[in-house]
Curated annotation (Swiss-Prot):
Single GO MF descriptor: protein serine/threonine kinase activator activity
Biological process terms in GO annotation: intracellular signal transduction
Intrachain S-S bonds: none
Bias type Pro residues, positions: 465-474
Protein name per its UniProtKB record: MO25-like protein 3
InterPro entries listed in its UniProt record: ARM-like, ARM-type_fold, Mo25
Record-stated family: Belongs to the Mo25 family.
Region entry Disordered, spans: 442-492
Lineage summary: Eukaryota, Metazoa, Ecdysozoa, Nematoda, Chromadorea
Pfam families: Mo25
Amino acid sequence: MLCLRRRTQIANPMINAVGETAEQAVKKLEKVFEVLKDRNERFPLTEISKQIDVIWESVFSVTHATAPQKKYELAEEFLNHPGVVKNLLMVFDGVQVETKRKIRDLLIFIRTWTSNDFLADAEGSLVPNPRQARPSQKFQDVLYECRFIMLHIVHEGYAGSDSIGLYNDIIRIFAEDDACLMFMLKDKGTDSNEVKQKFEGCVWAIFDRLFNTHTYRGFHILAEIFETFEIIFSQNHEASQYFFYNNLSRFSQSFHWLIAANNFFIQTKSLRFVRDIFSNRYMAEVRRQWMADPSLIKYVFLHLQSIHKTVCLEAVGLLNIFVQNPCNAPPIHKLISINRKLLLEYCRQNAPNPKDENQALDELFDETITYLVNWNEEEPAHEPTAQDTLKMRSIKLKMRREHTLELVQNEIPLFPRNNLLPTSPRQSSFVYNRRLPRVSSSRAGIRFGETRNVKGSPRSRSQSPRPPTGPEPSPRTTSYQNVRFPPEDSSR
C-alpha cells in the first residue's frame, strides 16, 4: 500500500487541502459522537449531516476532485476509526433521504477503495476495480462489529417508500460477508447479551411486511421487499442451506401463504422465488423435501387457472420442474397422473404463438408437453430402503474389484531413521504391477460393444486380440441373468 501511494503522489496544494479537510471531518465527526455518547444525549442530526456533506463532497464532487492518493488515505481513515462507521449506521434511520444516500455511498466507497483489486486509469494511477473488488479483512471486521445495528436495520425496515432501495444496498454490503450473513440468518431477536429484544428474527420480519398488504400496497415496495429476500438467500448457498435445514417447514408454509395471497404481484414473485430455489443445484435436498408437500402442487394447479398471465407462466415453470422429477413422492405422482390429460390440453392451448418469437417461453411449454406425453403412470421407486442400498453398494464394490488394477507393493526393506522410529517409504519404493484377474472370476457373459479394427494403426485391437473368455453373445441380446448378487450377511 505504501508503494501504491508513492506512485500516486500528487503535489497539488488545492487537492491536498481538500483531502486534509476530509480527514479532519472524519476525526471531528468521531469527536461529536463521543461527546454525545458521554452526555447520553441524542445525536444532533443537523450537525452530523453537515460533516457527512463535507466528506461526501471531497470524494464524489466533480469540482473538488480528490486524488487517488487522498482517497486511499480517507478510506483507511474510516477503518482506523470503526466507531464512526458504526455511528453512521446507527443514525441511518433518523436522517433525511439525501443523507441516507450519502451514507450508502460512503460505505460503498470504503469497501471499494480498501479492496485488493486495482486497475490503471487514463493517467496511469491505480484505482480499484468496482466489479471484482474483494473487501479487505479489516473492512469485514468493521462490518462484524456493526452486526447488531445491521440486524436492527433489517428488522425495522425502511422509514419511507423512497428509501427502500438504499436499505437494500446496505443489506447487500452486509450480506457479502459470510460471517455477517450467517449471523443474520441465525438471528432470533436477541441483543449482544442474549436478551430477548424482538419477538422474531429479522428474516421473519420481512415476511410480516409482505403479509401486511394493507400497509405496503405499491408494486415498487413489494418488488424491493422480494429483492431483500434474493439478497439474503443468493449470496452464500451454504448459509442458505443451514437456514433451510433448520426452518424449512415454517419457511415453506410462509411462502405457501404468500402464494395464496389475493395480490397477483405477490403471487408472481412468490412462485418465481420458489422456482429459483428449485433451479439452484445446491438446493437439491431442499427441493426434494419441499416438493414432497402436496399443498405446493395444488397451489400450482390453482394458479394455472389465474386470469393474470404472469401468474400462469410462473405456475407453468414450477409444473415443468415437477414433471421432470423422476422421483416424485407417491401423492405428487398420483395427482399428476390423474390430471395429465387436462394438463396436456392446457399447455397446448396456452402455448405461445410462434409469431411472438419468445424462444425461452416456447421451449418451456414444449418441454412440459413432452414430459407429460411420455409420463409413466406407474409410481416410481421412491426412497430406497437400507437393505437395497447395502446390496447395491456390495455389487458396486465387487465390480470395482473385478475391473480395476490391483496395486502391489514391492518387497523392499524399510530402514528406521536413527534406528529408532520407522519411516514411511518414499514414492520410488513402490512398484505397481498389473495382476490380471482369473478367468473363473471374470464375467464372461457380458461384453460391452465389439472390437473395432483400425486400419494402419500399430496399436490396433485386431493385432492384439483379447483372449476368449466365453461364448460371444449376439448383438443387442445380451442377457444379464448371469449376474449373481452376493449372499446376504446374516449378521446385518
